[in-house]
Amino acid sequence: MLSALATSAVPGFQAVSAQSLSTPERDAALVHDVNSFAWLVELARTEPEEALMSARHSAARALSEGLRSRLSFRVPKLHGTTDVGGKTLSVSEYLPGRELVPARVTPILAASVGKALAEIHQLPTSTLLDFDRPSQSALDSLREAAGIVDRAAATGLLPQSLLRRWETACEDAGLWQFETTVIHGLMQASRFLCDGEQVVAIEEWRELRIGDPARDLAWLTTPTMSSFSPAVITSYRSSRSSADRYVAQRARFWAELDIARWLLHGIDNGIEKVIEDATDMVQALHDRVSGDLDQALTMPISTNKHPLAT
């Protein structure tokens, strides 16, 4: 059915085979055309999924040919859409490769990941502004982080030493002196599609925007990535000479604040299981970083005037 509907989205489209990739949230199929080219045809089943797909389509349109030409890997490319019962059916290029598995990352693959991240962060920001993608300054990033810390502190569930660690990071003006870049915005291991030891595609760009490049590195600072993250960061820095001095420290900070966000999500929505899970994660983080200078976010604290100081 999806392959037949695809002809309305892409005139002249001729499917010869289709493989279902459907989930409870969406109908989807991997479709091959008469030229043996692979396409992804999707149709949301739920309103939340429709909203997600709309965000993906918007980001895909912002990934212009000019931006794509600067990347050594493939990204989603939307070829057509059509309305089906009030929802949007889309036809896009099927991205090749297999999802990155952290336990199987070799030094060569780690270098490829670092290079891919650097390429994203070196894209010109002007194109995203032309497409009205969100833009967050360094000061905006600091204010967001400080807001999360303040809200988490108000729960009374943070160990005092962990709270002070986060407050110190917010108070360090040097940590927040960086140039914003194009960022993926939802980066994690599963976004990378690989062929052998090379990154061949990156998916899920719905949060594409201008912001702190450290956000795209946060996933690397979690314990499960420790076996290869140093190699990724080394490759990233060698591929992007303009990377700021404290990008790795901010990446660690954003990863820690993700735990605070999880805690706040549970509290805001009254989900006890989430609150319990997040509280355990907070304690585990506290135990891991307490007294370990290798885990420091800022050392020493900058003496520069704080950006929010009046």
Where are these regions (language model features)?
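Active-site Asp-x-Gly
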Residues: 195-244
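A conserved alpha-helical element in kinase catalytic cores
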Residues: 2-8, 42-86, 101-115, 119
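A cross-family kinase active-site recognition segment
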Residues: 74-77, 81, 99-156, 180, ...
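ATP-binding glycine-rich phosphate-binding loop
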Residues: 8-35
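A conserved long alpha-helix in the C-terminal portion of kinase-like catalytic domains
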Residues: 224-289
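Active-site acidic catalytic loop and adjacent metal/ATP-binding pocket
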Residues: 24-34, 40-41, 170-215
